[in-house]
């Protein structure tokens, strides 16, 4: 009977041991995710539960896990205690957001706010209530408020984007206009340069005679007419594009509820002219009707067929017309007389090999004027006898430095100087505008949303000083009790740490203002500007974070990015885990 009782006791003890082992392997460990597959024990030959450190350095009894003694070098055996200094404790926070805290804060007698479920304190030193339901409710309420704020700010941001795109289109039109002006100025400079060369190398009487002919006058008039028509056409194109942008804004912002039939009729007629109304009707017929407010920036800019037809240059583009202006009228007249008169024309220049026109190079300076007079007399006799009909001669340069140049040369030189100066100014202006255009995506945001804020300033009174912040301008410290203003720097760039890509929203959330006024016995002042989403622009806070380095917090709708995009980036930054502290 005694033996039977002992056997029963042994069986019961074995069953309890097996049940405890099974329970220990099935119960989630404290301080771990519920699906922590790496914390699963194995049985050895004696059916004892064993477990290896995550770094593989040791094998322990399963009972050594979370026994408040650090056995593993990597601290992986104590996820739920403070025994290992470098490990992390996982708070489930059911009803709120999970979080990790350092293991040294476990069972330290302090209720950590990150663990709203109180799981970090379980040794009886202090009782931490489970506040996750309340905290989660407050967090979700705050999240909804932030989302509403972001959506309201995003609508203002859309207006900034529309304004930025409008300014970009105007800049494109101005560049196109200047490109034509540069082309015309280049041709004028070349023409005046040729006239200067001709004035310096040709006989004045012959040129004056040609200039007075009706043919020369007609050629000049035709070329001037072509240039004037081209400039006028370019100006009309630019004005057409500008008016189209203005009407786009009217069509986009028009409110039909005001029942202004005149404006409504004008908007409907304009949409029909642009083809927008037909496109909208087609979209309605196919069921592709977007929600109100969605894609409101690009609603008008889809159809440009009518505008492109008006801007098309047809069979006579400027590249073709410019060929008619490349020749000087005098050269055209000379070529027009070619063929029948080539055998009678005599050309002479410094490069001609004829001895008649180079003999003065071998004569003493005092005899050269008499020789030139004799040559002129001979040429006049030949021309009157119809032996030759035309002559171009280069007279030898006078060795007398005080002799003034002919009036025709002076006039031609002044005209060429003015044309060259105009070309230089126009080219510089065009280069400057192209530089501004290239900065749109790198300076004013991915969608040019910051362009509308350029040089707009906002200030905040901080007691002793008032701080003024200007978008893409200066940051200034202004004493409230009088005194000189101090520059904290001018805008330099976004992303001062150079650790993010322009495709990321976080890239546009921080600016640096550098090269401010030098501190006394210190470096130049600078400021780091942190931007956050809001429905209005304002300076929130300013303080001197380090010596001569200021921190400025600014609210602006320009950084109210689409919520889905920001949430995806936030998840990526957190390594795929959404971890939130208590608000």
Curated annotation (Swiss-Prot):
PROSITE patterns: ER_TARGET, MRH. GO terms for cellular component: glucosidase II complex. Its main location: endoplasmic reticulum. A motif (Prevents secretion from ER) lies at residues 580-583. One of its GO terms (biological process) is N-glycan processing. Residues 130-252 form a coiled coil. Keywords: Coiled coil, Disulfide bond, Endoplasmic reticulum, Signal. Subunit of glucosidase 2, which cleaves sequentially the 2 innermost alpha-1,3-linked glucose residues from the Glc(2)Man(9)GlcNAc(2) oligosaccharide precursor of immature glycoproteins in the endoplasmic reticulum (ER). Specifically required for the cleavage of the final glucose. The subunit beta retains the catalytic subunit alpha in the ER. Heterodimer of a catalytic subunit alpha and a subunit beta. PANTHER family: GLUCOSIDASE 2 SUBUNIT BETA, N-LINKED OLIGOSACCHARIDE PROCESSING. This is Glucosidase 2 subunit beta. It comes from Mycosarcoma maydis (Corn smut fungus).
């Amino acid at each position: 009977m005694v033996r039977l009782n002992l056997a029963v006791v042994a069986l019961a003890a074995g069953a309890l041991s097996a049940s405890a082992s099974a329970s220990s392997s099935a119960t989630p460990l404290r301080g771990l995710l519920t699906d922590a597959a790496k914390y699963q024990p194995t049985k050895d030959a004696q059916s004892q539960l064993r477990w290896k450190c995550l770094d593989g350095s040791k094998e322990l009894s399963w009972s050594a896990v979370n026994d408040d003694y650090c056995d593993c070098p990597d601290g992986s055996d104590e996820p739920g205690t403070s025994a290992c200094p470098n490990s992390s404790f996982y708070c489930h926070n059911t009803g709120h957001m999970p979080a990790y805290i350092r293991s040294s804060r476990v069972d330290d007698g302090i209720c950590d706010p990150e663990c709203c479920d109180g799981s970090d304190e379980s040794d009886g030193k202090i009782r931490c209530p489970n506040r996750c339901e309340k905290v989660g409710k407050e967090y979700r309420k705050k999240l909804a408020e932030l989302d509403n704020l972001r959506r309201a700010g995003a609508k203002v941001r859309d207006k900034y984007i529309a304004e930025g795109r409008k300014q970009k289109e105007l800049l494109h039109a101005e560049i196109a206009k200047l490109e034509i002006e540069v082309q015309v100025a280049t041709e004028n400079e070349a023409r005046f340069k040729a006239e200067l060369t001709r004035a310096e190398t040709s006989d004045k009487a012959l040129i004056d005679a040609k200039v007075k002919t009706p043919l020369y006058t007609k050629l000049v008039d035709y070329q001037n007419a072509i240039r004037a028509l081209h400039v006028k056409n370019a100006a009309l194109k630019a004005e057409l594009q500008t008016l189209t942008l203005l009407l786009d804004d009217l069509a986009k912002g028009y409110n039909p509820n005001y029942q202004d039939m005149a404006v409504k009729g004008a908007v409907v007629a304009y949409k029909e002219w642009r083809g927008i109304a037909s496109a909208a009707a087609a979209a309605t017929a196919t069921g592709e009707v977007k929600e109100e407010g969605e894609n409101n920036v690009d609603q008008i800019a889809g159809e440009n067929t009518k505008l492109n037809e008006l801007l098309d240059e047809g069979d006579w583009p400027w590249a073709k017309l410019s060929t008619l202006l490349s020749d000087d009228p005098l050269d055209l007249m000379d070529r027009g007389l070619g063929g029948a008169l080539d055998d009678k024309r005599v050309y002479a220049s410094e490069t001609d090999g004829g001895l008649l026109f180079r003999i003065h190079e071998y004569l003493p300076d005092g005899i050269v004027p008499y020789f030139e007079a004799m040559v002129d007399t001979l040429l006049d006799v030949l021309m009157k006898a119809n032996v030759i009909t035309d002559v171009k001669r280069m007279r030898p340069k006078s060795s007398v430095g005080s002799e003034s140049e002919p009036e025709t040369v002076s006039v031609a030189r002044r005209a060429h100087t003015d044309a060259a100066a105009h070309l230089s100014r126009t080219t510089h202006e065009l280069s400057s505008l192209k530089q501004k255009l290239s900065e749109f995506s790198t300076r004013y945001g991915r969608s040019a949303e910051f362009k509308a804020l350029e040089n707009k300033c906002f200030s905040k009174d901080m007691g002793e000083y008032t701080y003024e912040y200007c978008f893409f301008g200066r940051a200034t410290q202004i004493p409230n009790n009088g005194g000189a203003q101090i520059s904290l720097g001018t805008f330099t760039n976004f992303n001062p740490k150079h650790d993010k890509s322009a495709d990321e929203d976080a890239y546009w959330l921080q600016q640096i203002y550098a090269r401010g006024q030098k501190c006394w016995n210190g470096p130049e002042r600078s400021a780091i500007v942190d931007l956050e989403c809001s429905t209005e622009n304002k300076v929130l806070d300013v303080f001197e974070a380090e010596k001569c380095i200021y921190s400025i917090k600014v609210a602006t709708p320009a950084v109210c990015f689409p919520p889905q995009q920001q949430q995806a980036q936030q998840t990526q930054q957190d390594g795929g885990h959404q971890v939130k502290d208590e608000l």
